[in-house]
Amino acid sequence: MSEVIEGNVKIDRLSPGDGKTFPKTGDLVTIHYTGTLENEQKFDSSVDRGSPFQCNIGVGQVIKGWDVAIPKLSVGEKARLTIPGAYAYGPRGFPGLIPPNATLIFEVELLKVN
């Protein structure tokens, strides 16, 4: 099931979560993710590192695409997020890894909301 939200961020739900525990603005979340460019070139993966990523969601600690998409997921849910450049790293990109204005694709699993 696909859903397009703010900023043309697309959420493709891969497997359901608990359906009731959704992060709210400012919550600490624990996420496993793999990030790729549209050409499928991987640029980062918490899965490969064997260490989930933690951040406070909705408060600008991460790219805007995550801030708007992660609160739509429930604990345990896996999803593919397609995030246009304006809601990712924008015109600056991330030198050496992500070109300017690149659309990013993340496979994410919301492990925990603290």
From Swiss-Prot:
Main location: cytoplasm
Top EC class for this record: isomerase
Listed transmembrane segments: none
Protein name: FK506-binding protein 1
Family: Belongs to the FKBP-type PPIase family. FKBP1 subfamily.
Domain annotation PPIase FKBP-type: ranges: 26-114
Catalytic reaction equation(s): [protein]-peptidylproline (omega=180) = [protein]-peptidylproline (omega=0)
GO CC entries: cytoplasm
Reported function: PPIases accelerate the folding of proteins. It catalyzes the cis-trans isomerization of proline imidic peptide bonds in oligopeptides.
Gene3D superfamilies in UniProt: 3.10.50.40
Location(s) in or outside the cell: Cytoplasm
One GO molecular-function entry: protein folding chaperone
Record's keyword terms, sorted: Cytoplasm, Isomerase, Rotamase
GO biological-process terms attached to the record: chromatin organization; negative regulation of homoserine biosynthetic process; nonfunctional rRNA decay; regulation of chaperone-mediated protein folding; transcription by RNA polymerase II
InterPro entries assigned to the protein according to its UniProt record, in alphabetical order: FKBP-type_PPIase, PPIase_dom_sf, PPIase_FKBP_dom
Regulation: Inhibited by both FK506 and rapamycin.
EC number: 5.2.1.8
